[in-house]
Structure formats: structure tokens, C-alpha cells
Design a protein with these regions (language model features):
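Aromatic- and Gly/Pro-enriched helix-to-coil junctions and flexible linker segments
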Residues: 1-463, 467, 473-474, 480-872
Length: 872
């Protein structure tokens, strides 16, 4: 394969911070701490140089939140490295008919914020296209040119390793006519971030400083107002997103000159709010969402999900072959019923995540025990990870009985009796009022004749003795059966005579009997009865003491299509009857009656994995000796061996739902139309590419930045064009403005569960007292791993005994007033991280004490300290 070059991660994440200079690097593994670095973006490493160090502080010396940079690098793909390898300065590269040494990397990034000029966010409206009458944000501004001013557009920036290592997305750019908001309150916006390259040529993208403000502040107090969790006219924030492109610079010894090679396709960067709980993942991460989409929309794992009958030889379809994918999606698709997930790799992490929410909110702490990892709880990984055990010696003995009974005809007759019993019962019931009772369908005489006929056929087919090896017997049987066409026809004729002899039944019953017997005979001839007998042997000799525990947890899950169902009903004899479905989190729309989706659910792929596990179809890799996982640190062993590992490691730290509108980015991410392939956004090349092609740059020898980097042939669009691709700002524009409003309110939601299809009911309109008395609501969490409710916090420095359970946002209520407070309070909030002096093992009774708290809030910026700093 020709060498290709790609940017990874495909989607990078930068995070806001109000520290003017201090920053770190976003984690590149799931549930990890940020990577510590120096002022030039070079990671700090262990003395042996093998491991990057993580931060010990999330804030600078003055208590201001550090920004987190998204880091990008180039990976090379060729025959030696089909899964990619990191490319380094000094490596040999090829492209454009040239070959040489990599001496530099030019990076081009274009950030923008389109929130204020986009549509109002109204829950799920717009996910499948916007109604022509859907309201716009800042709808009072109607002129197209005027609305263009609602887009924050600093233009593209470029950096490289040799001559221009930093760039800034500021309003004062001589080479590009930028668009920034007018003066705002409480905070104006004059930058969307910065670029820099480290000493190895990798790119770091830093986002904004968390500034949000409105130009509408002429109320009686001279202050802006927030009236909604998602849509607030006049407001802007400095979140952003956009494409990341790279060009390789080589020195070609053949021509003794510099030549240029573009990477295959752009990556994307999202600049979002801080990660306050970096070591606890969401129940569904963005990686889970994209993985599910990759499997069900892009045919990426046809060994797991594909056309019926193809799992032994999975289809292979390129992710960019749209006609083939459309044809595949229209087929008979299903999940592979025989696939065995690994417990610690695939199952335990799904169960582990919600259990960690106990340390982020009061709600679970009061109601969820002993639903935890203690030996008394239902989340005991040693029990849940114990697969069914099969007594293979007993199975072998049972298989021998199957073989002998198959050869003698006993199995044929016994299974036929069981198959005819429902029909015989039905016929007997219909004839119960008749004067003469009907004879049995399969009399002993008839059964004996059938047994003899089948046994005779078996002796002729495979000999007098069936042997003792089950697989060998089955193979010989199938081979003989396929070649004995004349003998099979003779047997079928003989069976016809036996079944039809002396029949005292009406013609319709006799015909039905004949059909059933011949269907059964076909199972016998094909070997199906023998295979079924083996399955029964295995099932009978399988010991699964923890199967009921697995099934109980699975039965609690909210299946696809049950997003509006609160409790499990209709199963009064079940242990789960009357219990709430899980996960008990808010869905994509628990607020309005337009496209309601009250509660959250797992992805289809996660649900499938847990279904296999519940049925006992899984491996425990620890028991098998394949791995030695740490159940209490399920991601500790994550290593980015491939570029896909890096893609997944980064994006796993982004919220994967619910999307109302969501965390960093929203429901647009599950739309396959915005993806070139899984983990790579389809980009509008007019806004992602360098102004000149690599060939033009090679012909010119060198091209200054200003000659091509800042050229713009058209404005950033105020509409979508998924065929062409996404432009800068097209991912974050769906999110709330300012981001602090939705972030503050996504703590809990009161969901009306009275009726499945209605989020809002109005008993007062009809004076319906019965409806009012029967009305039920449930206070439901949104996503505590992003926005905690309560946390453990050490209130006295250096005194672990002072650890106390406190509200995470004291003085900031879940109201519009609280939303406005959050605009200036967000950076003061504490960060929840693993407790260095604690233990992750809960106490035997399930309620952790101070010394057993696994997560603790740190670095809360106290107001009194800030005042002292300002005075000094």
C-alpha cells in the first residue's frame, strides 16, 4: 500500500480556562488526568523518559483554571504499519512523486463560534432537519449581512516547527478581517484561543478563556439577563470548533530542494468547558456513541452486526462506499448471537461507571446501597464476572447417549413424541365432545415401526456402531446422509406407509400429522436432532450460580424504544416488577411534548453486549489467563498502541448523552452524514485546506503564510451542507449560549411520569382532580460525571478527618439567576479527583467513611483569597 499520512486524534478536545498563561494537555486515555507540560507544550516525563506525567494542580497559583490543550500528531500508514505509527521529524517520507526527510510540519487550524446565529435549541427538533418555521436565535436581527456579525470568526491560523511556533485567534489580525462581538457584560470576547507546536512538531490547540457576555445589558441594574437554559439573545461565549489540517515539509536529496506533502484529510478540534471530574466517565461516552454508529451505520464490525448468515465470513465494506453501505443497511441485519464479549474489557466498565456516581450526588447515596461493589451488593465483579461452568465429562457421557439413541432410532421417536404432543392435545380437545374418542397420533406400534426404519437407515449409513466421538459421528452422518439420496427417499416412503397405515383421523389431521413427521425426519437426516441433543447436554450440565444476578441487572435495563417508560410493568411475578428502568438519567427531551424522550438509555451496542453477558455468553479474561485487569481501575492499563486507540482515548472523555443539548457537543454527532468515516468529521475543504495545493507550494519552493493561509473566498455559512462537509463552528453551534447556563441547570430535572407520551399535562384546564391526584413526577439526574451535585471535600487543610459531604456549587441555584452567577463562578468550582489518601474499597456496610472516600473535591477557589489578591 502507498504510504499515507493522517492526523490523530481524529477529533481532539481542548478545554477552557481563565488562567492567562498556565495550561496542560487534555488526557489521551479514558478517565485519565491531564498531561503536565512546560510553557512550550512539551510534556513532562518520568526520569527514564518513558511515561508522561499528569498534573498535580488544575489551577494556577492564583486559583485560576488552567486551559487544556488538544494535542495532534501525524501518523504514517504503510505495509509495515497498517494500523499507523507516529511520524517524527527526521523520518523518511514520500509523496507527490518525491521522497526525502521530514524537516518540518505546517499546521493550519480554523476556529469559529456560530452559536448566536444558529437556530434555537428546542430539544430534538432539528435532529432530522429543521422545520422552515423553526425560530432563530437573535431573531430580531433579520438582515443576512447583519446576522453574519453573530458569528465569531477570527479566520484561520498557521504554525510550524521551525519559524512560526505560535499563533493567536485574536481580534487584532492584520491579515484577515475578523468578526468579534461588541463589548459585552460581564466579560467581553477578543480571542478564541491559541496555537503552538512542541519541540517534536506536534500541534497544540488552546481554546478560549471561559469568557461569556451579552451586549444587552440596559436593564434597571445595568446587567445582562439569562432567561433560558439554552437560548439567550445578545449572548456570546468563547467555545469553538473547527478543522485541523497539516502539510509535511521534506527535503528531497534528489532535487536538493524543499517539497510539500499534504496529509490525507483534516482532523477536527472542539474547544469546550472544563472537565471537572476527569477520572469518572459518563455512562455513555462519545466514544460509545461513535462506536455504535460505526458498527450499525458504517459496517465496521460485521463480525458483530451484519447480514444474517454472514458472521462466519463477514462482509467488508469501505466506510466511504456510500452505495454499498446503503445496500447493506437495507438488508436483514442482526447482532451475532454467538459473539462472546470479554467481561473486564467490554462489560465491567459499563457497570462500573454508574456506580461511581455515588460520590457525585446525594440522590444515589441515599437510595442506591447496597447497589455497589461490596460483597453484599449486586455489583460484585467477582460474582458478575463468573461465567457459567460446564461439566465436560458429564457432557461427554450425555453426548454418547445421544449418539447411541440417534443410531438406534430412540432419539427420533422420543423427540417426535414431544413435538406431536401439542397437536395431539389439540386434536383430543376438539374431539372431547364426540361419541368416539380419537386414537393417539403416535401409538406404540407406530412408534416401534418408525424406530426400526430409522435404525435400519442409520446402520446402512454409518455402520453397525456409531462410535464414541461426537464430532466424528456427526461428520460421518452428514457425509453419508448427503450421498445417500436413494436410501433417504426409501426411508421417506417407508415413513409415509407407517404414518398413513390404519389412520382413523380425518383427512386434515392426517395431512398435518404427515407434514409434522416429515419435518421431523428432515431434522434427523440433516443431523439437526443430534446437534440439538448436544445443546441439551451442555445446558443440563452447565452450572451458573450467578446467572440470576446477571439476569436481574439486565432485566432492569431500558431497552431501545423504551425511552419514555419509567417503571417496569406487566411482570407481576418478576423481581423487577415495579422498579424503575435503568439507567435512571434524563433523556434527550424530558421537558416538552414535542418528540418526548424522557429517560436515557445505553447504545444498542452496549445493550447487546450486556444481553450476551446476561445469557452467560462471555469470557472472563482474567480466569482464562489472557489479562490481569484491575477492576477498581478499569482503564489503568490503556495504551495507545494504534491511532484508533488514540482517537478513542481522547473522545471517551466527552459526554455521549443525553443531548438536551448535551455537554461539549450534541446529537449531531450521531448523524452519519457528518462523518467521512468513523472518528473523522467530513470537512468543507474550502475552509480546511491550505490556500495553495502542496504541488503549487513545491513549485514555488516556499510560500509565506500571508500569501495563502488567510484567503477566504466566501463567508462562513449560516446554514448546513452535509454533502460538502462541516465548516468551523458547525459542531458547537447546537449547544447552549452561554454554555454556563445549560451546564448549571443540567443537575436534576423533574420529569412527569404520569403518561408515557407526555412530558407536560394540564389537569387545571379541565378541573380534572383525578388526573391531578394521579400525577407523578420523578426528580432525575442529568450527567453527574460532568456536573456533580454533591462531593466529598476536605474543609480543613491537611486534615483528612475534616472530609465532609458538601454541595458542589454553593450559592449557585438551578435557576436563571444561578445561570447568570455561573458565568462568573465556573472557574472557582472545585475539581473532583481520586483521593490520594483514600481507598477505592467501600466499607463492608456500603457507606464509605472519610478514610475510604475514593474521590474528593480539590482546589476550590475561595472568594476571600481572590479579594486579597485583587487588593494586593
Amino acid at each position: 500500500m502507498p504510504t499515507t499520512y493522517r492526523i490523530h486524534p481524529g477529533v481532539g478536545v481542548a478545554r477552557l480556562g481563565n488562567s492567562p498563561d498556565a495550561f496542560c494537555i487534555t488526557p489521551e486515555q479514558p478517565a485519565a488526568l491531564p498531561i503536565d507540560c512546560d510553557a512550550r507544550g512539551n510534556p513532562l516525563v518520568t526520569p527514564d523518559g518513558t511515561t508522561e506525567l499528569t498534573v498535580t494542580a488544575f489551577k494556577d497559583e492564583e486559583g485560576r483554571m488552567k486551559r487544556q490543550a488538544a494535542r495532534f500528531q501525524i501518523w504514517a500508514y504503510d505495509d509495515e504499519s497498517p494500523n499507523g505509527r507516529p511520524l517524527k521529524l527526521g523520518d523518511h517520507i514520500e509523496g507527490g512523486g518525491n521522497a526525502g526527510t521530514l524537516i518540518d510540519i505546517q499546521w493550519r487550524v480554523y476556529l469559529a463560534n456560530k452559536k448566536s446565529g444558529w437556530y434555537d435549541f428546542l430539544q430534538l427538533q432539528g435532529e432530522h432537519g429543521y422545520d422552515p418555521n423553526h425560530p432563530l436565535r437573535n431573531a430580531a436581527i433579520t438582515d443576512t449581512n447583519a446576522r453574519q456579525r453573530l458569528i465569531i470568526d477570527p479566520g484561520p491560523r498557521t504554525v510550524d516547527h521551525q519559524t512560526n511556533r505560535t499563533a493567536h485567534f485574536t481580534s487584532d489580525n492584520d491579515a484577515y478581517a475578523t468578526i468579534f462581538p461588541p463589548p459585552l457584560k460581564p466579560n467581553s470576547i477578543d480571542t478564541l484561543g491559541d496555537l503552538l507546536t512542541d519541540d517534536t512538531g506536534r500541534l497544540l490547540v488552546l481554546g478560549g478563556h471561559g469568557n461569556s457576555g451579552s451586549y444587552l445589558f440596559d436593564d434597571e441594574f445595568g446587567q445582562p439577563r439569562i432567561n433560558d437554559y439554552a437560548n439567550n439573545d445578545g449572548w456570546f461565549d468563547d467555545t469553538s470548533d473547527g478543522p485541523v489540517m497539516a502539510r509535511l515539509v521534506m527535503f528531497s536529496p534528489l532535487v536538493q530542494s524543499v517539497r510539500y506533502v499534504d496529509v490525507e484529510y483534516p482532523a477536527w478540534v472542539v474547544c469546550a468547558y472544563p472537565a471537572y471530574v476527569p477520572e469518572i466517565l459518563d455512562v455513555v461516552t462519545m466514544d460509545d456513541v461513535i462506536e455504535d454508529m460505526a458498527i450499525r451505520q458504517f459496517a465496521e464490525r460485521t463480525d458483530l452486526y451484519g447480514t444474517t448468515g454472514t458472521f462466519d465470513d463477514p462482509q467488508r465494506i469501505a466506510p466511504t462506499d456510500e452505495p454499498a453501505l446503503i445496500h447493506w443497511r437495507a438488508g436483514r441485519l442482526r447482532w451475532n448471537p454467538d459473539y462472546k464479549p470479554w467481561f473486564y474489557r467490554d462489560i465491567w466498565n459499563i457497570l462500573y461507571r454508574p456506580d461511581q456516581y455515588n460520590y457525585l450526588c446525594d440522590t444515589l447515596g441515599q437510595s442506591n446501597y447496597p447497589h455497589n461493589q461490596s460483597t453484599r451488593g449486586s455489583f460484585d465483579y467477582e460474582k458478575l464476572g463468573c461465567p457459567p461452568v460446564i461439566d465436560w465429562e458429564a457432557v461427554a457421557e450425555c453426548e454418547q447417549r445421544c449418539i447411541n439413541a440417534y443410531h438406534s432410532g430412540d432419539l427420533f421417536v422420543e423427540e417426535l413424541k414431544a413435538e406431536l404432543f401439542p397437536l395431539e392435545t389439540s386434536v383430543a380437545g376438539a374431539a372431547s365432545g364426540a361419541a368416539n374418542a380419537q386414537p393417539r397420533l403416535l401409538t406404540e406400534k407406530r412408534a416401534g415401526k418408525l424406530r426400526d426404519a430409522v435404525a435400519k437407515f442409520a446402520r446402512n449409513a454409518i455402520g453397525k456402531s456409531p462410535g464414541k466421538d461426537f464430532d466424528d459421528c456427526l461428520q460421518k452422518w452428514q457425509a453419508a446422509s448427503e450421498s445417500a439420496a436413494e436410501a433417504k427417499e426409501k426411508l421417506k416412503h417407508e415413513v409415509d406407509e407407517i404414518v398413513g397405515a390404519d389412520s382413523a383421523y380425518p383427512e386434515d389431521v392426517a395431512n398435518l400429522l404427515s407434514r409434522r413427521v416429515h419435518e421431523h425426519l428432515q431434522k434427523y437426516l440433516s443431523g439437526q436432532l443430534l446437534r440439538d441433543c448436544r445443546r441439551k447436554c451442555i445446558k443440563t450440565n452447565t452450572y451458573d450460580p450467578y446467572g440470576p444476578m446477571r439476569k436481574y441487572l439486565f432485566d432492569l435495563l431500558r431497552a431501545p424504544g423504551e425511552e419514555n417508560q419509567f417503571m417496569i410493568t406487566g411482570r407481576p411475578d418478576s423481581r423487577v416488577h415495579g422498579l424503575p428502568r435503568m439507567p435512571l438519567l434524563c433523556g434527550d427531551n424530558p421537558m416538552t411534548n414535542e418528540l418526548p424522550s424522557k429517560f436515557f438509555r445505553l447504545t444498542d451496542f452496549q445493550y447487546y453486549l450486556l444481553r450476551q453477558w446476561a445469557m452467560g455468553i462471555f469470557y472472563n479474561e482474567k480466569l482464562e489467563g489472557w489479562a490481569d485487569p484491575d477492576p477498581l481501575h478499569p482503564y489503568a492499563g490503556w495504551i495507545n498502541r494504534t491511532a484508533r486507540d488514540l482517537d478513542r482515548g481522547v473522545i471517551s472523555n466527552i459526554l455521549g448523552g443525553s443531548f438536551c443539548p448535551g455537554g461539549e457537543i450534541g446529537w449531531v454527532m450521531r448523524n452519519p452524514s457528518i462523518w467521512l468515516e468513523p472518528y473523522r468529521i467530513k470537512a468543507d475543504r474550502d475552509f480546511s485546506n491550505f490556500g495553495e495545493t502542496a504541488a503549487q507550494a513545491s513549485a514555488a519552493g516556499s510560500v509565506p503564510d500571508s500569501d495563502y493561509a488567510f484567503y477566504a473566498g466566501e463567508d462562513l455559512s449560516q446554514a448546513n451542507d452535509f454533502v460538502t462537509g462541516l465548516q468551523p463552528g458547525d459542531l458547537t453551534k447546537y449547544m447552549s449560549v452561554p454554555w454556563q447556563a445549560d451546564f448549571n441547570e443540567c443537575s436534576t430535572q423533574t420529569i412527569d411520569v404520569t403518561y408515557e407520551k407526555f412530558n407536560q399535562i394540564y389537569p387545571a384546564s379541565d378541573n380534572d382532580q383525578l388526573m391531578k391526584r394521579q400525577q407523578r413526577v420523578w426528580e432525575t439526574l442529568w450527567w453527574p460525571a460532568h456536573r456533580p451535585m454533591q462531593t466529598y471535600e476536605q474543609v480543613v487543610p491537611n486534615d483528612s478527618s475534616s472530609i465532609t459531604w458538601l454541595d458542589w456549587t454553593p450559592g449557585v441555584p438551578q435557576t436563571n439567576t444561578g445561570d447568570l452567577k455561573m458565568v462568573t463562578e465556573w472557574w472557582r468550582l472545585s475539581v473532583v479527583r481520586s483521593n490520594p489518601s483514600g481507598t477505592v474499597q467501600p466499607s463492608p456496610m456500603g457507606t464509605p467513611g472519610p478514610s475510604q472516600v475514593p474521590y474528593i473535591s480539590v482546589e476550590r477557589t475561595k472568594r476571600i483569597e481572590t479579594k486579597k489578591e485583587e487588593q494586593s
